[in-house]
Regions:
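Bacterial N-terminal signal peptides
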Residues: 8-14
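A "functional boundary" signal
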Residues: 2-5, 17-142
Length: 142
């Protein structure tokens, strides 16, 4: 009986680990395609489930928001990008993802007609980038 329990738990852990690696691999693939083939990235992201650790869910939310924006799909509901922010705001060392999250959140706010809200987010990015050399993100703002 004890052996069956151990065997069952081992199988669950094995298959969960395989799924997790596959999920992360698909997120990596979508991220790599975002700049030049955003439609392909969006297709991959639509095939994935919003599961995994909080970090994986936040990454998915950020990538999906970015893919929607790059495919010119107008989104005015900020619930998805706020999910990413609820994770990245606690990770100041991940400045790149913090800035991307704030940027795409600002883009959603602009589309929703909330220009002051968008401006606050863009100014927050500017403040975060003040002491760094991140020309890509500064370029997005201007």
């Amino acid at each position: 009986m004890k052996c069956r329990i151990i065997l069952g738990l081992s199988a669950i852990l094995f298959f969960t680990g395989c799924y997790n690696r596959e999920h992360i691999s698909r997120l990596d693939e979508a991220e790599a395609l975002l700049q030049n083939k955003p439609d392909s990235a969006l297709t991959i992201l639509k095939q994935l489930r919003r599961e995994g650790s909080q970090a994986e869910q936040a990454r998915y939310a950020l990538l999906y928001s970015e893919a929607l924006d790059k495919n010119h799909i107008k989104v005015t509901d900020d619930s998805l990008i706020r999910q990413a922010w609820s994770h990245y705001k606690h990770h100041p060392k991940d400045l790149r993802r913090q800035c991307k999250t704030l940027y795409y959140w600002g883009r959603v706010k602009l589309r929703a007609g909330d220009k002051p809200g968008a401006l606050r987010l863009f100014l927050e990015i500017e403040e975060k980038l003040k002491d760094t050399n991140e020309p890509y993100y500064a370029g997005l703002l201007y």
